[in-house]
Amino acid sequence: MLSTLMKLLSACLWPSSSSGKSSDSTGKQDGLLWYKDFGQHLVGEFSMAVVQANNLLEDQSQVESGPLSTLDSGPYGTFIGIYDGHGGPETSRFVNDHLFQHLKRFAAEQASMSVDVIKKAYEATEEGFLGVVTKQWPTKPQIAAVGSCCLVGVICGGMLYIANVGDSRAVLGRAMKATGEVIALQLSAEHNVSIESVRQEMHSLHPDDSHIVMLKHNVWRVKGLIQISRSIGDVYLKKAEFNKEPLYTKYRIREPFKRPILSGEPTITEHEIQPQDKFLIFASDGLWEQMSNQEAVDIVQNHPRNGIARRLVKMALQEAAKKREMRYSDLKKIERGVRRHFHDDITVVIIFLDTNQVSSVKGPPLSIRGGGMTFPKKI
């Protein structure tokens, strides 16, 4: 028991070796690519892959399957989290460490899973990171400009809950009864001001600010600074007391603001799982910059399950190389940091829905993080 615990701790604290010989229980590493080709969750199978582009990996992710509360009585199910950080990895790491724990606590209080449980978990996580920023502001003020998108899926009792802030995306592959064709259905709402309806929402929330969204270098940005309108963190755009010196000038807004510019409130939807619902693709926007929803669904539908997340990542990288008129083999040689000029960090989790298991109560517990590691808690 003790040796098993030590192995798990070791896997959590240090990345897998680049040789790819690491235990498959925590995934394998191949250069900047980490992958868990195949595993079992409570209601089916899953595949997971992450490729790093930033100097420090800003994408964090997790799959948890088994008890979704602190109670032995449950509820039981599967939790998927994709946390695409920006400005640094601190917020996405914080979310990875705290959101699921908050969800378990609130699910225990209500003895069930619900939209309210998920909303409270987001609120507690946002409040927790605000506490980190408040504490570190005197010595590390730039942490006020670090944030993360946060996409969550919860499968529980035959229901699927999708919650999101930011522009990561969850897509369902559903078989059409008449033809058997598997079509892509986007389940998550995105909060990126490149979308006209999101720009309109920002204008309606801030009618007195004609510069709430600005076109800068041909890209729409909130206050000319950030593309997303909702996030965890980014406290410098939520509380005016963190938008001043000693924060870097590039993050500071000239005119004071009285209400938050960005929101941390998730859009949450409920979906009753149907027999024709075949699989779910959860991914950070690094994937969706390279392929459409239907292209991703077609790839998953037409290839073996084993290694399918890694295949999606590889095809996204091939597309990124093609856009830059270079060979995929040459792209793979580019080091982290420099690689960010060619593509973003990419995280993909594919969850297969075996409907005969969807309403099952218990199963073997699973807990895995993208990259096969966490980091020593410094915040």
UniProtKB/Swiss-Prot annotation:
**What are the Phosphoserine sites (modified residues) in this protein?**
73
Cofactor binding: number and manner = Binds 2 magnesium or manganese ions per subunit.
- What is the main EC category here? hydrolase
Tell me which residues bind Mn(2+) 1.
84-85
Q: Does the keyword Oxidoreductase apply?
A: no
Q: Which InterPro entries match?
A: PP2C, PP2C_BS, PPM-type-like_dom_sf, PPM-type_phosphatase-like_dom
Question: What keyword terms does UniProt attach to this protein?
Answer: Hydrolase, Magnesium, Manganese, Metal-binding, Phosphoprotein, Protein phosphatase, Signal
The protein's required cofactors:
Mg(2+); Mn(2+)
Pfam families given for it? PP2C (PF00481)
Q: Does the keyword Kinase apply?
A: no
Q: Which GO terms describe its molecular function?
A: metal ion binding; protein serine/threonine phosphatase activity
For this UniProt entry, which residues form the secretion signal?
Answer: 1-20
- Output the SMART domains linked to this UniProt entry: PP2Cc
Q: Which reaction does it catalyse?
A: O-phospho-L-seryl-[protein] + H2O = L-seryl-[protein] + phosphate; O-phospho-L-threonyl-[protein] + H2O = L-threonyl-[protein] + phosphate
- Supply the PANTHER family for this chain: PROTEIN PHOSPHATASE
> What family classification does the UniProt entry report for this protein?
Belongs to the PP2C family.
According to UniProt, the name of this protein is Probable protein phosphatase 2C 46
Q: Which gene encodes it?
A: PP2C46
